[in-house]
Design a protein with these regions (language model features):
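N-terminal charged helix/coil linker that caps or initiates catalytic domains
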Residues: 1-33
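Glycine-rich phosphate/adenylate-binding loop
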Residues: 2-7, 114-122, 126-213
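Hydrophobic Val/Ile/Leu positions in short beta-strands of Rossmann-like dinucleotide-binding domains
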Residues: 35-38, 59
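Hydrophobic/small residue at the entry helix of a nucleotide-binding pocket
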Residues: 41-42
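Conserved S-adenosyl-L-methionine
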Residues: 51-56
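Glycine-rich phosphate-binding loop and adjoining beta1-alpha1-beta2 segment
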Residues: 61-95
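A structured beta-alpha segment of the ubiquitous adenosine-cofactor-binding alpha/beta core
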Residues: 85-91, 95-120, 127-130
């Protein structure tokens, strides 16, 4: 048995307090966000938020882990065939077993989106397809939610083209806004991860009251 098996909640919380200070720790600990889509963006965003100390997440995806996901998504060979919601929850609890992780293994549609995300004010859009992204963003803005979306992170172009833009007080878009996976050698881990980090960081900023980019 590893030494980590004996680490309790108090030790994890104290380690986060030492890193961030009590004020930031408690703001994050008392916050929650929903992640729609657990692919290259969502699986990495979830990991970053849990490492930062967020108190709760809702993970939503209908898909299972496939070998083709491993080039950019935060999963391992042992997860192939598992629902992404279950695989992500397992990994996140290996980082912090005390974070509250709710899951919903469902296909998000215009008809069910409001009900799925009704208990969350911060929604992270992490879908693959443009039409699904637009559907969720529009649905959540109609529900007066704050949305952090990803758009344009394909290929291996310059990292510096990926930026965070504030569109309205309720909508932030991270990415280069241009590249499509069909045009630039598909999706690769570095730029996908950079975009995921932009989204995770913006969510942290919103939680901590920093709404500018």
């Amino acid at each position: 048995m590893s030494a980590g098996a004996d680490i309790g909640r108090a030790e994890i919380e104290q380690a986060l307090i030492e890193r961030h200070g009590q004020d930031i720790f408690y703001k994050l600990q008392n916050a929650k966000a929903a992640i729609a889509g657990l692919g290259g963006l969502g699986s990495n965003i979830a990991m970053l938020l849990v490492r930062a100390g967020i108190g709760g997440l809702l993970l939503v995806d209908f898909d299972t882990v496939d070998i083709t996901n491993l080039n950019r998504q935060n999963y391992y060979i042992r997860h192939i065939g598992m629902p992404k919601t279950e695989a992500a929850k397992e990994l996140l609890h290996e980082i912090n077993p005390y974070v509250k992780i709710d899951t919903n293994n469902i296909l998000v549609t215009e008809e069910n989106a409001a009900e799925i995300f009704k208990d969350y004010n911060i929604i992270c859009e992490a879908f693959d397809r443009a039409e699904n992204k637009a559907m969720l963003v529009n649905s959540m803005l109609c529900e007066k939610k704050t949305v952090v979306s990803g758009s344009g992170m394909a290929g291996y172009l310059s990292s510096n083209t990926i930026k965070t833009r504030k569109i309205t007080d309720e909508l932030y878009i991270c990415g280069d806004g241009v590249t499509d996976s069909a045009d630039v050698n598909g999706l690769m881990a570095p730029r996908v991860s950079i975009c995921a980090a932009h989204q995770a960081n913006m969510i942290l900023r919103i939680i901590l009251g920093e709404t500018d980019i």
